[in-house]
Amino acid sequence: MRKTITATPRGLMVDSFPYRLYQKAKKVGTWNPAEIDFTQDAKDWQAATDTQRQSILRLLSQFQAGEEAVTLDLLPLIMAIAKEGRIEEEMFLTTFLFEEAKHTEFFRTVLDAIGEKGELNLLLSDSYKQVFHVILPETMDRLITD
């Protein structure tokens, strides 16, 4: 059975570091990837050389995959914190998850704007995949049962 924390005399620990981060996130986390105009980026992409495009695409694919991985893998941490009743940390981590989701949207929007729809996982190194596709999810999933 869940026990409500904020409805008790304890309330919220408004002076705690996680709660202050939560307040800061509400103030400064107001950007929207869908509102960014990538028209000039698309033109610059077309003007870039093949070598430049390959380098940029490799970087974009790493950012895209990394942001998506963090978006997916933060939930077990939030669940573990919630089970411990650390509401202020949970509140902050939900804003962190929201920002990671926006990063995922941002990089996908960039890729769409420049017309890149191909299989980007092919550009990721084996060591990158090991960290973000194997180690990170396995480690974070342990938080659910540990």
Q: Which residues fall in each region the model found?
A:
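Non-heme di-metal
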Residues: 1-146
